[in-house]
Amino acid sequence: GHKLKETIYQYIDLWQLGEDFKTWFTECCGVYATLVDRIVPGFPRKEIDSIKEKLQYNDNLVVQAEIFHLWVIEAPEPVAKEFPADKAGLNVLFVPSEEPYHQRKVTLLNGPHTVLAPVSWLSGVNIVRDACQHDILGKYIHKVMFGELLETLNLPKEELVQFGNDVMERFNNPFVDHSVVSI
């Protein structure tokens, strides 16, 4: 959001739209920083035939995604009233700063993914779920997440442990074959 706003101001100047336009944009338009958290392993090769049959057309852009989703929007309170996406049953949070959520996700989801991908692949384990369930790799991933990465974050420990447990549950999702080489 911050970079987008900066870029819009550059174009306002480049296109010589004037100070009135810049004032209007500043006062009337919202540009917000956001964070999306959802594991999307990509094209569902194994299930594509049944998906085509169900949809009754060939969608070459279909992707598989986990059920879990989180959309964090850094915005002032009135935005939640104007855009009540959370009221539609979506996991949307309107917050004063997306930074703690960003740090939590990058550290406790992307971090373990980054750690497990090369060691899993070198061990002949190709799916994230299988790595988590492997006797040695699973313990290693758990130790890295809960014994090292979690300790680097400045958020309530209970919340971090719960998020870490949720991430491990997501990694173990039996319906998502998330390839370690895609990480």
Regions found by a protein language model. Name each.
Residues G1-I183:
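Substrate/ligand-engaging "lid" and interaction regions
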